[in-house]
Curated annotation (Swiss-Prot):
SUPFAM superfamilies: Ribosomal L11/L12e N-terminal domain (SSF54747), Ribosomal protein L11, C-terminal domain (SSF46906)
Disulfide bond entries: none
UniProt protein name: Large ribosomal subunit protein uL11
UniProt GO MF annotations: large ribosomal subunit rRNA binding; structural constituent of ribosome
Post-translational modification: One or more lysine residues are methylated.
PANTHER family: 60S RIBOSOMAL PROTEIN L12, LARGE RIBOSOMAL SUBUNIT PROTEIN UL11M
Subunit structure: Part of the ribosomal stalk of the 50S ribosomal subunit. Interacts with L10 and the large rRNA to form the base of the stalk. L10 forms an elongated spine to which L12 dimers bind in a sequential fashion forming a multimeric L10(L12)X complex.
Pfam families: Ribosomal_L11, Ribosomal_L11_N
Gene: rplK
Signal peptide (residue range): none
GO process terms (BP): translation
Key word RNA-binding present: yes
Transmembrane segments: none
Amino acid sequence: MAKKLVAVVKLQLPAGKATPAPPVGPALGQYGINIMAFVKEYNEKSASQAGSIVPVEISIYSDRSFVARLLTPPAADLLRKAAGVQKGSSNPKRNPVGTITRAQLRQIAQQKLPDMNANDIEAAERIIAGTARSMGIKIVD
């Protein structure tokens, strides 16, 4: 008989630095899974992406087992790194905070494509460009 899926928990954690403290402990503890096993697995899988936020989707089953699937870092995080800024603009239309090139935009779109709701790279680029615009990051050719 197949295992019954109880819940899917999504968290955004620093790569390689997850601890059983909040937000991980309370989010997973209520389902009775081994928190330390998850923390070890997450830190091993995400160690190569140190310094960025890596979302994880945890499928929890009725026998208290789980499957953790790492996703790509948030688009806003990738855009901030590419533009070299700490945070987005408080007023994106009036005062832009940085710029990125079309090549950087395409690279971010290619990285995000597996986790995006887009069929091709052009659609993914438009989605990422919209995120950049709302953050006050200009795209130059």
